[in-house]
Amino acid sequence: MRLFFLRHTSLKVEIDVFYGQTDLDVSDNFEEEVILIKKKILNFNIDTDSIKVYSSPLKRCIKLTNTLTENYIIDERIKEMNLGDWEMKKMTSIPEREKLEWENNLLSFKIPNGESNEEFLKRLKSFL
């Protein structure tokens, strides 16, 4: 079995902002980025109508998926990480104590009102 993962295109969001599961729209470069993605898919000889395609329910993912195929399955488990209180905040606005704890415990640190990397990975593994 071969697996291919696509990440969504660029988003309408400031640089250095944690956006996680916030349902942001794609940037104005969407069409150009889709052309590049389709070219890469062609290089792998993938017929998107004859394979199973899964998408996160976030609109940035659905929008890209709709340009590739009409037949896809939406799965909540492949959403971005839940960044809780860090959603839509710049790194500079995250309390130093939380940043330090995050840096020292990358796997187990749970973002306040969000999820830890460990929880995120467990969710993704349940998809696979």
Residue locations for each model-derived region?
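Phosphate-handling substructures
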Residues: 68-123
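Secondary-structure boundary/capping signal
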Residues: 49, 72-73, 128
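Short amphipathic alpha-helical segments with coiled-coil-like heptad repeat character
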Residues: 39-40, 100-104, 127-128
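Active-site-proximal alpha-helix that buttresses catalytic centers in soluble enzyme cores
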Residues: 6-68
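A structural signal for well-ordered alpha-helical segments within the folded catalytic domains
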Residues: 59-63, 118, 125
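Solvent-exposed alpha-helix faces
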Residues: 35, 125-126
